[in-house]
């Protein structure tokens, strides 16, 4: 059987690729809403997506300013194993951050009681360190320690991987989070405490034959989505991949030519920057143009603070077109209007960027569901093609 599998892999390609299935679940927002907690949560937390990318305050070297509320709408999750024998965790594969962290048995917070906890004493390969980790959000921080262990990711045994073990997770809202931790896939330059990101460690050990990974997010309610390490599977897209240079090697940041609706520029008229982020669900941009888009599509705020649209209007709404490196990438209303349990909400979100970097957009899952995306570290570029 093993020989048959090996022959099949060789016949398929000279490159062996590893696929991590992603499962689509209810987002933290939906869980809070169903428990009657969303309105109170939104009232207490002034959500600003920009804080994930541009912390407002400088922090010590060991502090990772990564607000956890930014994962409020994420719906795609995968399973990894840490330790020997492996202890399983549900994580967000996040191209908008670079650290790996999971809850640990040292955590006494309410949020940890509803999640899988890593126990170093149950792993024969765990190595402790004196390093610490603190991820800030809202009114508190997730604090923890750093350690090394073997991480199992889609059939890859990533040995000697540094990761964070949470000790406190303030904020009872995390109790309802459908994920245990975060696996960051951005560049090492934004990694907290100089920790080597998972994909960098995998590549450095020669565990994949190509220095890239790719993502397919299915619109299906549950299955089909995947992260592919070390290769590209053309069955997930149509046509050819179009390549876009990374403009800043930190996040997966690219240049956008324009953003139009009905042939008219609605934002980014003179070009702008965008971050391709699997850890953000929505299409996020500056407050002013987003407010105009919300008005144009007839979105209004409901009692929970969500921007809702009449479901019957979807068929009459226009595409939003992102022109990137000379190629047009339309996002249809069926993609940017999110339908759930008979209600329709806008897939756009405003943010205030406290930097001098100009107009910045976040191309989250609303965009990635439309376009198979390759994150090419070898050539510092992003590949995009319409999903099959």
From Swiss-Prot:
Its EC number is 3.4.23.1. It catalyses: Preferential cleavage: hydrophobic, preferably aromatic, residues in P1 and P1' positions. Cleaves 1-Phe-|-Val-2, 4-Gln-|-His-5, 13-Glu-|-Ala-14, 14-Ala-|-Leu-15, 15-Leu-|-Tyr-16, 16-Tyr-|-Leu-17, 23-Gly-|-Phe-24, 24-Phe-|-Phe-25 and 25-Phe-|-Tyr-26 bonds in the B chain of insulin. GO terms for molecular function: aspartic-type endopeptidase activity. Keywords: Aspartyl protease, Digestion, Disulfide bond, Hydrolase, Phosphoprotein, Protease, Secreted, Signal, Zymogen. CDD domains: pepsin_A. The active site is at 94, 277. Gene3D superfamilies: 6.10.140.60, Acid Proteases (2.40.70.10). Disulfide bonds join 107-112, 268-272, 311-344. One of its GO terms (cellular component) is extracellular exosome. It is found in: Secreted. The modification Phosphoserine is found at residue 130. Residues 76-385 form the Peptidase A1 domain. The keyword Methyltransferase does not apply. It is an enzyme of class 3 (hydrolase). Shows particularly broad specificity; although bonds involving phenylalanine and leucine are preferred, many others are also cleaved to some extent. Belongs to the peptidase A1 family. The expression of pepsinogen genes is regulated by hormones and related substances. This is Pepsin A-1. It comes from Macaca fuscata fuscata. The gene is PGA.
């Amino acid at each position: 059987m093993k020989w048959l599998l090996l022959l099949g892999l060789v016949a398929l390609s000279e490159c062996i690729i590893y696929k991590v299935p992603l499962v689509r679940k209810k987002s933290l927002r939906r869980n809070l809403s169903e428990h009657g907690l969303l309105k109170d949560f939104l009232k207490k937390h002034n959500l600003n997506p920009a804080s994930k990318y541009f912390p407002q305050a400088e922090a010590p070297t060991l502090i990772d300013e990564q607000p956890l509320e930014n994962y409020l709408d994420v719906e795609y999750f995968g399973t990894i194993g840490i330790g020997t024998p492996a202890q399983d965790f549900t994580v967000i594969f996040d191209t908008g951050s670079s650290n790996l962290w999971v809850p640990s048995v040292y955590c006494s917070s309410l949020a940890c009681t509803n999640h899988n906890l890593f126990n170093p004493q149950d792993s024969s390969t765990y190595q402790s360190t004196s390093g610490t980790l603190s991820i800030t959000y809202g009114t508190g921080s997730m604090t923890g320690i750093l350690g090394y262990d073997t991480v199992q990711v889609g059939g890859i045994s990533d040995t000697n991987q540094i990761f964070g073990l949470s000790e406190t997770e303030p904020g009872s809202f995390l109790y309802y989070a459908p994920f245990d931790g975060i696996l960051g896939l951005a560049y090492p330059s934004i990694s907290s405490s100089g920790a080597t990101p998972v994909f960098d460690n995998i590549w450095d050990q020669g565990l994949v034959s190509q220095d890239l990974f790719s993502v397919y997010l299915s619109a299906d309610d549950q299955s089909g989505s995947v992260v592919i390490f070390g290769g590209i599977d053309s069955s997930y897209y149509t046509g050819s991949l179009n390549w876009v240079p990374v403009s800043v090697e930190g996040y997966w940041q690219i240049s956008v030519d324009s953003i139009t609706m009905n042939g008219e520029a609605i934002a980014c008229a003179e070009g702008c920057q965008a971050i391709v982020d699997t850890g953000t669900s929505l299409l996020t941009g500056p407050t002013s143009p987003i407010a105009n888009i919300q008005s144009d599509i007839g979105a209004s705020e409901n009692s929970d603070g969500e921007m809702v649209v009449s479901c019957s209007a979807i068929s009459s709404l226009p595409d939003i077109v992102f022109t990137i490196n000379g190629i047009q990438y339309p996002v249809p209303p069926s993609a940017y209007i999110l339908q759930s349990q008979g209600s329709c909400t806008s897939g756009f979100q405003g943010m205030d960027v406290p930097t001098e970097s100009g107009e910045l957009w976040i191309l989250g899952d609303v965009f990635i569901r439309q376009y198979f995306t390759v994150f090419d570290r070898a050539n510092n570029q992003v590949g995009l093609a319409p999903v099959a």
